[in-house]
A protein has these predicted regions:
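Class I S-adenosyl-L-methionine
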Residues: 1-109, 114
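A contiguous loop/helix-start segment that scaffolds small-molecule binding in enzyme catalytic cores
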Residues: 2, 71-75, 131, 139, ...
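Structural recognition of alpha->loop->beta junctions
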Residues: 26-27, 96-102, 126, 208-216, ...
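Class I SAM-dependent methyltransferase SAM-binding "motif I" and its flanking Rossmann-like core
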Residues: 84-155, 198-201
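A generic local structural motif
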Residues: 14-18, 38, 62-63, 120-121, ...
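Short secondary-structure boundary/capping segments
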Residues: 20, 42, 67, 124-125, ...
Length: 252
């Protein structure tokens, strides 16, 4: 069996229990070497074959998978965070499907969750934002025009941006053009949950200068929105006057 496993955002102990078990049982592990914490490879058994996909093409990755499957081996394709976000797993799965090779997907903790933990923040605050936009700036991989930063910014929802650290000046321009104020709270979270994690609070207008000052050029998430401010409405969920399926509200 081939299993796509989410390694989590960085810290070794943030891989899921299932992911940890699959890693321990694997005969072959192909890991995203540029992003996955190498400490996780200590879980692999002694004779496990380990491949760093940072140095491989899609065809080379598939060749290892196909041969391993033919030899009856358990294979783990270890991706950073949760593979469903910017993990390039669809093209691998489609090729395996064509070859009628079975595979499964083991979800992981995404780095955008790790960033929230680093910020000690909640992305959905009553009266502020109940939606989260996960997106990226267009780079070598284009972004559909209908999904432009400017169009998303018009909603004033919480935004979490992947793969955009090297384009922060342009990002600020697009956010402001879409409707955010330059003073809107923002944050840069470098390597969330890793030992070298760094959190930088700033504003939409100071994203680029903050990253330059802190010498951050990659491996960071950008969070934008008023949820990073201090004012919000209390949640109804635990309000004494609010009735739920499990608790009757009281008059206050």
């Amino acid at each position: 069996m081939i299993t796509f496993v989410g390694a989590g955002p960085g810290a070794e102990d943030l891989i899921t229990v299932r992911g940890q078990r699959l890693l321990k049982e694997a005969d072959i592990v192909i890991y995203a070497g540029s992003l996955v914490n190498p400490g996780l490879l200590k879980l692999c058994k002694e004779k496990c074959e380990i491949y760093n996909s940072a140095k491989m093409t899609l065809e080379e990755v598939l060749e290892v998978m196909v041969k391993g499957h033919g030899d009856g081996k358990e294979i783990v394709r270890l991706h950073t965070g949760d593979p469903c976000l910017y993990g390039a797993i669809r093209e691998q799965m489609d090729e395996l499907k064509k070859l009628e090779i079975p595979y499964e997907d083991c979800p992981g903790v995404s780095s955008f969750c790790g960033a929230a933990a680093a910020l000690k923040a909640e992305y959905t605050l009553p009266g502020i934002s109940q939606s989260v936009v996960i997106t990226r700036m267009a780079g070598r991989t284009p972004v559909p025009e209908k999904e432009s930063i400017r169009s998303f910014a018009a909603h004033q929802a919480t935004m979490v941006l992947f793969l955009s650290t090297g384009m922060l000046e342009k990002l600020s321009e697009e956010l402001v053009a879409g409707g955010y104020q330059e003073e809107t709270p923002a944050a840069i979270v470098y390597k969330a949950t890793w030992p070298e994690e760094k959190v930088m609070h700033c504003t939409v207008g100071t994203l680029a200068e903050t990253a330059e000052r802190e010498k951050v050029t990659k491996t960071a998430l950008i969070v934008v929105g008023n949820v990073l401010n201090t004012e919000y409405e209390r949640s109804k969920l635990y309000d004494p006057a609010f009735t739920t399926e499990f608790r009757k509200g009281k008059e206050v």
